[in-house]
Amino acid sequence: MSLASFNPSRKTNKVRQHGAMEFSDPPVDLDKVRQERLVRFRKKMAEHEVAGLLLFNQINARYATDATNMQIWCSHYETRCVFVSLEGPVVLFDYADHPHLAEDLPTIDDYRVLPAFYFFSVGNRGEEFVLEFAAQISDLMNRYGGGNKRLAIDTLSHTGCDALRARGLELVEGEQITETARAIKSDDELKLMQVSMNVCQEGMRAMQEYLEPGMTENALWSKLHETNIRLGGEWI
């Protein structure tokens, strides 16, 4: 099966913020933060002696690449993932085909469309697509793993795990890598967290100003979500 593959451009005159702080000036160098996070993942990968890290948890995928695509939807289905090689490329297997969402991100070396294999997407053709998925992951492991077959995964259904094991890969618990890496915060990340807190507080102020007798709870909560989205937040 031929799948679209795209190498994002490396323009230096623009910093894609992908929703976060889209219409404001970031308080830190976002590309620096992105690179540091990827380094943390790879450091933990080396500690656990794995050649690859497969991320279906969208929080982990965002941490590794900072690329986003319908995060809530993609959190409900195995429809988008990131493969991080210890000594090779980072590959984004995206939902649908939207390479513009990965443009200019220094953390992504290869863009592909995921051959999704969950039933809602492919019905009874799941076995066909999961074999293609496993073939691509196995190829990346063989090409860049240096003979190491250990692949860490944060979360994946038995269908995907069985197909990967059939390719001779040794699957390792990935959350021990992602959680311990993400627990470390740089000074720049603390500044970004403060911005997130400021947005939340602004949303709470909007709720207080909008509150009036007789209104529904949903109407009140909508002001928090409205403020969050308007100021660059993704979801609550």
Question: Model features per residue range: what roles?
Answer:
Residues 1-202:
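A composition/biophysics-driven feature that prefers long, compositionally simple stretches
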Residues 33, 212-220:
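Short, charged, surface-exposed loops that flank catalytic or proteolytic processing sites
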Residues 45, 211, 228:
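Hydrophobic pocket-lining residues that define ligand/cofactor binding sites across diverse proteins
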Residues 150-153, 207-215:
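Conserved short loop/turn motifs at secondary-structure junctions
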Residues 197-207, 217-220, 225:
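Active-site pocket-lining segments that scaffold enzyme catalytic pockets across diverse folds
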Residues 222-236:
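Acidic, glycine-rich loop-and-beta core segments that form the ion-binding/anion-interacting portion
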